[in-house]
Amino acid sequence: MNDLQTIRTRAAKMFILFIFAHIVLIPIIAIILDVPFLDVTIMAIAVSLAVGLTWKFAGINAAATHYIIAVGLSLMPAIITYLFKGHPWQIDIHMYFFASLAMVTALCNWRAIIIAAATVAVHHLVLNFLLPVAIFPSGADFFRVVLHAVIVIAETVVLLWLAIKLEAAFSQGAAALSE
């Protein structure tokens, strides 16, 4: 296993554990907020199972595993944002989307970054119209969705550049060592 694969393996394992930790974290947050937790816990279990099963059947460094990890890292903030619906901190919880998108970079896989960003974008756009209180305390706000999209695009461009450069650097390093 080369250095890039080692980093990807460690990152993927860490993220799988992190995603599964939400099965415990989400009901705890719900209890603290004094809100129902069965629906959000089921959502967290479903996302975690999708991640875990993909890892089991595709392998830790399979593209599919990286992609489902990216989706999982994007959906957990969505579930927690929904959990905070109507709470004064709901809009603050959106920072978790930006943090989770940045975390995907540790996979050094630019496609996973695009998938994570697309998951966040689709989530915001769809829920803005179907269930706006699940994302914004004041309800539907198309221009807020556009603002968030611009920020996510800016972050994604930088993360893509970084992931591509990291992958190239590891490839060049491996080529230099083999000479």
Label for each model-derived stretch:
Residues S171-G173, L177-E179:
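Long cytosolic alpha-helical coiled-coil signaling stalks of chemosensory transducers
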Residues M14-W89, I93-A102, V120-V122:
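Hydrophobic transmembrane alpha-helices and their membrane-interface boundaries in multi-pass
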Residues F98-I115:
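Canonical bilayer-spanning transmembrane alpha-helix
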Residues I28-V47, V51, H87-P88, W110, ...:
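Alpha-helical transmembrane segments and their interfaces in multipass membrane proteins
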